[in-house]
Regions:
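Arginine residue identity/basic-tract feature
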Residues: 9, 19, 32, 121-123
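Short, hinge-like loop/turn segments at secondary-structure boundaries
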Residues: 10-14, 38, 108-111
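NAD(P)-binding Rossmann-fold cofactor-contacting core
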Residues: 1-16
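Adenosine-phosphate binding glycine-rich loop
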Residues: 66, 70-128
Length: 128
């Protein structure tokens, strides 16, 4: 939790208009902020095994609130299933992973990868 709080403070120091909260990963910590949150982001490995967040009532998230789970396998984590069933916009970590791969490719080779190639290949690998 201390590391997360340091990172949060660092972002808010750099971007004064941004308000972030670091909370314990439990119903009391997360649940307290859902009614006022614009975005819920999971950066943990919870959900990778197909279970997790049983305690979270994502329907308490304010209307228009979005859910992002950095996990990319499975593509629809328990958290994202909850978001979907509650009607909240959601996304997984595939887009971020692809963007990081494309940037790394550019840095290593000095060239841009062909559009869509990495995403197509990643999806094929994840579907195996």
């Amino acid at each position: 939790m201390e590391k997360a709080e340091l990172l949060t403070r660092g972002v808010m120091d750099k971007y004064a208009q941004v308000r972030l909260s670091t909370v314990p990963l439990n119903s009391a910590g997360v649940g307290r902020y859902l009614p006022i949150a614009d975005l819920v982001v999971n950066t943990t490995s919870v959900g990778m095994g197909g279970s997790g967040f049983d305690w979270l009532d994502i329907s308490a998230l304010q209307k228009g609130g979005k859910v992002y789970d950095m996990v990319y396998s499975p593509p629809l984590t328990p958290l994202l299933v909850k978001a979907k069933s509650s009607g909240h916009p959601y996304a997984n970590g595939i887009g971020m992973l692809v963007a990081q791969g494309e940037e790394a490719f550019s840095l290593w080779t000095g060239e841009q990868p062909p559009p869509g190639v990495m995403k197509t290949r990643l999806r094929a690998l994840l579907d195996k």
